[in-house]
């Protein structure tokens, strides 16, 4: 179990209120996300980590091999087809897929000229979608025929052609390079954020471009989940045994008589007391329902005042950010009678 004082290493840090999405610029393939406030340095730490995971670790689908009827290798031509095999393979690499299964699938193209063959001409099954059906693959002349089989699967990152080569494949099967990542580009920027009178916080702005097989918002969520799962091995204690006052049962919070005391009884510094008075916080019950971010927005209220109040509340078994239903109560509890 984590020691109470050790737990302050992470519980005392400011957390971002939420992740905001720029709805004005959002598209199915682009998203801009903003998280603030963050402790100084956390903007770069989180931004760089999310960027690396987004670009390297998210799964996608891609074509891995192609077999063209009448073709034995990629360094040749196809009768009545304008593009040679190398050009056709290059065009197939840019076909965007979405797969709803982890199984390897075989797709087909069966076309006769004259015709411009596009990605939309690929014959799929219910588990596979073509996301860019207008993408050009090749052009067949009058009298020409094209038959090909395409193998596709899910994966992550980049896989070179030699890795996609499967032992025992029929002669004429051509392995191709596969870019599985659904992420096309990621940018992040860290700027200053203000919380009340304090300006030494970070604001993280993250821009994500995808190929359309996953939404930018889902991509960020998946990346954050990957980071979270990878970091759990470094936590060498069980925090579930540590009681968190802010999440205590509401019945216990109501029975804490300190909630009904005036904040004047806290013996705060003059600055802190004036800030509470200015914010119209009269009782400790009013105080504990304020979050750290809300307190820091109070004029002249800084980190020193925040630390002072948190330490005093902790001695009472209370904390900021508590949720008290039906506050203030209609009738405060009677003061405890002295023992005989």
From Swiss-Prot:
Signal sequence, start to end: none
Record has Nucleotide-binding as a keyword: no
Annotated spans, Alpha N-terminal domain (alpha-NTD): 1-238
Keywords recorded for this protein, A-Z: DNA-directed RNA polymerase, Nucleotidyltransferase, Transcription, Transferase
Keyword check for Transcription: yes
Recorded GO CC terms: cytoplasm; DNA-directed RNA polymerase complex
GO molecular function, one term: protein dimerization activity
EC number(s) from the headed UniProt entry: 2.7.7.6
Cysteines joined through disulfide linkages: none
Reaction it catalyzes: RNA(n) + a ribonucleoside 5'-triphosphate = RNA(n+1) + diphosphate
SUPFAM superfamilies to which the protein is assigned, alphabetical: C-terminal domain of RNA polymerase alpha subunit, Insert subdomain of RNA polymerase alpha subunit, RBP11-like subunits of RNA polymerase
GO-annotated biological processes: DNA-templated transcription
Region (Alpha C-terminal domain (alpha-CTD)) residue spans: 253-340
Described purpose of this protein according to its UniProt entry: DNA-dependent RNA polymerase catalyzes the transcription of DNA into RNA using the four ribonucleoside triphosphates as substrates.
Comment on protein domains: The N-terminal domain is essential for RNAP assembly and basal transcription, whereas the C-terminal domain is involved in interaction with transcriptional regulators and with upstream promoter elements.
Subunit structure, as described in the record: Homodimer. The RNAP catalytic core consists of 2 alpha, 1 beta, 1 beta' and 1 omega subunit. When a sigma factor is associated with the core the holoenzyme is formed, which can initiate transcription.
Similarity comment: Belongs to the RNA polymerase alpha chain family.
Name listed for the protein in its UniProt record: DNA-directed RNA polymerase subunit alpha
This protein's encoding gene: rpoA
